[in-house]
Regions:
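TRNA-binding/sensing appendages of the translation machinery
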Residues: 1-28, 36, 87, 94
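Cap/lid and interdomain-hinge subdomains that line or gate substrate/regulatory clefts
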Residues: 74, 78, 82, 99-102, ...
Length: 314
């Protein structure tokens, strides 16, 4: 974990002088628990969670240092299962109006860097410039690396390879190695699966999306809702993380940031009902309760009356 950004972590010391940090996300803790507590269990593993996480924020930026995250992790299945996680993410996004799920793949950038044989420092500098879309500085830096015109052209166009799913076809023109085309082939296969499932609405592509955490190894995605100034959902594939805890398993997942949603989205409270019934009509009452649960929560309450009746409560 030596490459993980630590400046956004809250750090303190224990009684033995060891440095401890408050968790900044839940992916690492879940990976550790899966690799250790479930080491004798057979994958795949499917986890869900809700927890508070903590990040040091820039002063006066208007962002909370403590936020509530909830999410899912699918551990033990390879990239062919990405579509399962993406469909879950889209089901979350469908609860809001005017949403967008933006999909990228860090392998597209990583494969290019591997072919060019860039150092870790050079990769990090390039990623930072591409992420910020600092085109002038990016061109100056690429020129300093003395790369071929075709490779420079690839990195200069990378920040702009974004839009609807047709951008994947356009991206082939900038591929200078077969490994880059293989990444695009994999993404097109995933997009085709989403289309067959009827889940392609409001999906966009951003091949210039560069992950900030070093454990992402494949597909990455973020969800946006109109009126919220930040992504409310983010996730991706992290096939190398569990290996650090002694068990080599692929994984993919995402988390949902609840706090910005609470601030910007009206929450529709579900109705509450009490259904009174005589013991002789318990089955009929249960059937009626199942229908009512589509509108809200239902409490079944035995009654001395001979008829079933429903009362809505505040």
């Amino acid at each position: 974990f030596k490459n993980i950004q630590t400046t956004d972590m809250y750090k303190f010391f224990d009684e033995n002088g060891r440095i401890l940090t408050l968790r900044t996300d839940m992916t690492v803790p879940i990976a550790r628990v899966c690799a250790s507590k479930f080491k004798d269990s057979k994958p795949p593993f499917r986890y869900r969670y809700t927890s508070n996480v903590f990040k040091v924020r820039q002063k006066f930026a208007g962002k909370r240092s403590e936020v509530t995250d909830c999410g899912i992790e699918l551990i033990g299945l390879d990239s062919k299962s990405d579509v399962q996680v993406l469909c879950c993410a889209l089901e979350v996004m469908k609860n809001f109006k005017n949403y967008t799920l933006e999909i990228g793949n860090v392998q597209f950038f990583q494969a290019a860097c591997k072919v060019v044989r860039l150092s870790t420092e050079e990769i990090n500098t390039l990623a930072n410039l591409i992420d910020k879309k600092s085109m002038v500085d990016l061109k100056i830096y690429l020129d300093s690396l003395y790369l071929s015109e075709k490779i420079v052209d690839f990195f200069m166009h990378l920040p702009f390879l974004c839009g609807d799913v047709n951008i994947l076809d356009e991206a082939y023109a900038y591929c200078f190695d077969e490994s880059l085309k293989e990444v695009l082939d994999s993404m097109k296969e995933c997009i085709q699966s989403l289309n067959e499932l009827g889940c392609l609405e409001n999906v966009t592509i951003d091949l210039g999306k560069v992950a900030h955490l070093d454990y992402y190894t494949g597909i990455i995605f973020e969800g946006y809702v109109s009126g919220v100034g930040t992504s409310i959902l983010s996730g991706g594939r992290y096939d190398c993380l569990l290996k650090k805890f002694g068990r080599d398993l692929p994984a993919c997942g995402f988390s949902v940031k609840l706090d910005p949603l609470i601030d910007h989205v009206d929450v529709q409270l579900k109705k509450k009902f009490i259904l009174y019934y005589p013991e002789s009509k318990q089955i009929e009452a249960m059937k009626q309760a199942n229908k009512l649960r589509k509108e809200g929560s239902v409490i079944l309450e035995p009654s001395l009356n001979e008829t079933i009746y429903v009362k809505e409560v505040e």
